């Protein structure tokens, strides 16, 4: 949810984001997922109903969900092995990764979609995106330069930088 910031400039938790939608603080959203469970969705019907009155909802996911049924636009998502770039996991560890396989024809990873929407020239370059984020966000400053193979714990880097 890069770009969906709270009043104190932090990224909101999912429940806080849903509350922003309930109060119409947020009226448009691009939700990307990629959860490999077609039998059960990551977003239940009750949570998805909160998005009913949005002006614009883009959902990019591997599988249909209660949320994708409400989308203004539905885009196919690329799986983890079909992307390259930097991930930050739930433990606040940032790691770079390389694409292992090509996505199906017509499927673009989120980064490439954003790259094109921003009017960037040439091929999608996730390293330059990481460098730009590192330069412009104190919380991600540790992502500048080479990243060790085991990644960087962003919490430790923030603590060390204060």
Stretches found by the model and what they are:
Residues 1-148:
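Non-catalytic alpha/beta scaffold blocks inside enzyme catalytic domains
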Residues 146-162:
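Acidic, Ser/Thr-rich low-complexity intrinsically disordered segments
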């Amino acid at each position: 949810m890069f770009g969906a910031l709270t009043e104190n400039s932090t990224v909101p938790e999912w429940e806080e984001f849903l509350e922003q939608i309930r109060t119409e603080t947020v009226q448009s959203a691009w939700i990307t997922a990629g959860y490999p469970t077609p039998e059960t969705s990551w977003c239940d019907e009750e949570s998805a109903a909160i998005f009913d009155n949005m002006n614009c909802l883009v959902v990019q996911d591997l599988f249909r969900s209660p949320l994708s049924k409400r989308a203004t636009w539905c885009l196919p998502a690329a799986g983890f092995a079909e992307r390259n770039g930097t991930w930050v996991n739930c433990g606040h560890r940032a790691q770079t990764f390389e694409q292992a396989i090509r996505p199906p024809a017509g499927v673009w990873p989120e980064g490439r979609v954003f790259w094109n929407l921003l009017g960037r020239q040439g091929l999608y370059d996730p390293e330059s995106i990481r460098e730009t984020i590192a330069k412009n966000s104190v919380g991600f400053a540790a992502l500048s330069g080479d990243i060790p193979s085991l990644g960087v714990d962003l919490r430790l880097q923030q603590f060390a930088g204060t």
